A protein has these predicted regions:
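One-carbon transfer enzymes
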Residues: 1-206
Length: 206
């Protein structure tokens, strides 16, 4: 009996974090869950190709084509069709409403490229986060995987990993190091942790 937890990954761009999740599934790091669906807010996202290559179903819901409610309703329909239990935001560039988030309490996870509570919240995304860390002069940064609630980057922390900052770092160099040494490691590990806990709770009810 396959009682794996159904995972959806929401993307908008290149999908390097999605690839880390796919690789982790293949290598046995993620065993309690299975990626059943990739939803992209951008029809040209390379992440869709990565999903296709891995044999994962894809759905495109372009934000610009809909009101916020219609956009989210389309995503929810796709999630419900695949009986999705856990949602991973992997470079998803649209903010989800409080109503959407409330439907999946402690079931939506996001990776943020800093050690929350530093350099997070509204306006902190992509290279901006790394530029802020360098401008501030911190010696250590990293990545955080957290649950998503109605406050940007405000949900409970699941996992963090620190990355040292070097003297000659640029935002681009730092971004690459944080991705490779932190994000690509803790996002799959956190996804497995959340899925394992859900699976255990389901088994207790049987």
């Amino acid at each position: 009996m396959n009682n794996k937890v159904n995972i959806a990954v929401l993307v908008s761009g290149g999908g390097t974090n999605l690839q880390a999740l796919i690789n982790a599934q293949k290598s046995g790091i993620i065993t309690s869950g299975e990626i059943k669906l990739v939803v992209s807010s951008n029809k040209n996202a390379y992440a869709l190709k990565r999903a296709e290559n891995a044999g994962i179903k894809t759905v495109v819901c372009e934000r610009k084509d809909f009101s916020q409610k219609a956009f989210e309703d389309n995503i929810l329909n796709a999630l419900e069709k695949e009986e999705i239990e856990v949602i991973v935001l992997a470079g998803f560039m649209s903010i989800l409403s409080a109503d959407f988030v409330k439907r999946y309490p402690e079931r939506i996870i996001n990776v943020h490229p800093s050690l929350i509570p530093s350099f997070c919240g509204e306006g902190f995304y992509g290279l901006r986060v790394h530029k802020a860390a360098l401008d501030y002069g911190v010696k250590v940064t990293g990545a955080t995987v957290h649950f998503v609630n109605e406050i940007p980057d405000g949900g409970r922390i699941i996992m963090q990993k620190a990355v040292e900052i070097n003297e000659n770092d640029t935002p681009e160099i730092l971004q690459k190091r944080v991705m490779e040494n932190a994000e690509w490691i803790i996002l799959p590990a956190a996804a497995e942790k959340v899925c394992k806990e859900i699976k255990e709770r389901k088994n207790e009810r049987i």
